[in-house]
């Protein structure tokens, strides 16, 4: 068996070693700049915590419904849904956020809207360096299962500067699937560095023509209803429809890493 004996490993143009080896016991230390701990900015992304209650029925409008904590259901004129913390989940997870249609709406009004969102404080999203020349990309990853196949819209909304960016993902079967959406960096409009709401991550389920009449805004720009949820399937068109979400993760950069489980 061959072996290589070294004291350290250093890049060709580097001044410091990337890996330093202890010659006595063979252990090593590494100079790591992309620390993988505390990278997920979403709170309760695994949907494990539901302190207010595990289920809320008869929902017809915006509210922080019982079910997994930190998530708000927004919208109106979508029919009626039940929200709950479900045990239906992909491998590696125990819970999910479930939306179940109990009164269908197959004929949406122009202002019909149903979305799930979590909002983040400005002091917690400073790593994106938004509004500077060093602005970073946003890597959003999540698991979704739905009995309603079709195109769904996810959005990042900057509350401080009234800006947004949107992307779509396609549910093509009724199984659990992991999705990764990489949103561009934004050199315009910095997030306020305080404990107020600065960034919301939104998942659309229903959208009337007031939100779908333009072209989907896939680059950062001024927030506008008409370009915010274009192509969104009508999840509320049947009482057979269910939508589940878990493993939600938002991190800095162009690569979505494995979900960061926290106790």
Kindly label every feature range from the protein language model:
Residues 3-263:
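Extracellular and organelle-lumenal recognition/adhesion modules and their flexible linkers in secreted
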């Amino acid at each position: 068996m061959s072996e290589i004996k070294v004291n350290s490993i250093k890049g060709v143009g580097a001044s410091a070693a990337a890996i330093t080896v202890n010659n006595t016991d063979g252990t090593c230390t590494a100079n790591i700049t992309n620390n993988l701990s505390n990278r997920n900015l979403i709170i309760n992304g695994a949907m494990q915590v539901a302190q207010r209650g595990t289920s809320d029925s008869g929902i017809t409008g915006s509210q922080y419904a019982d079910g997994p904590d930190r998530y708000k259901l927004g919208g109106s004129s979508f029919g009626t849904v039940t929200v709950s913390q479900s045990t239906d989940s992909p491998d590696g997870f125990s819970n999910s956020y479930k939306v179940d249609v109990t009164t269908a709406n197959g004929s949406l009004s122009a202002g019909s809207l149903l979305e799930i969102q979590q909002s983040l404080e400005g002091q917690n999203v400073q790593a994106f360096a938004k509004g500077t020349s060093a602005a970073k990309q946003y890597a959003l990853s999540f698991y979704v299962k739905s009995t309603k196949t079709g195109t769904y819209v996810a959005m990042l909304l900057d509350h401080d500067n009234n800006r947004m960016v949107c992307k779509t993902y396609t549910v093509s079967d009724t199984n659990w699937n992991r999705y990764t959406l990489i949103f561009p960096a934004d050199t315009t409009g910095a997030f306020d560095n305080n404990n107020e709401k600065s960034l919301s991550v939104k998942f659309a389920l229903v959208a009337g023509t007031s939100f779908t009449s333009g072209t989907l805004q896939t680059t950062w720009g001024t927030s506008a209803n008409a370009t915010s949820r274009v192509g969104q399937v009508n999840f509320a068109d049947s009482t057979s429809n269910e939508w589940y979400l878990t493993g939600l993760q938002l991190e800095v950069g162009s690569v979505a890493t494995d979900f960061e489980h926290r106790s």
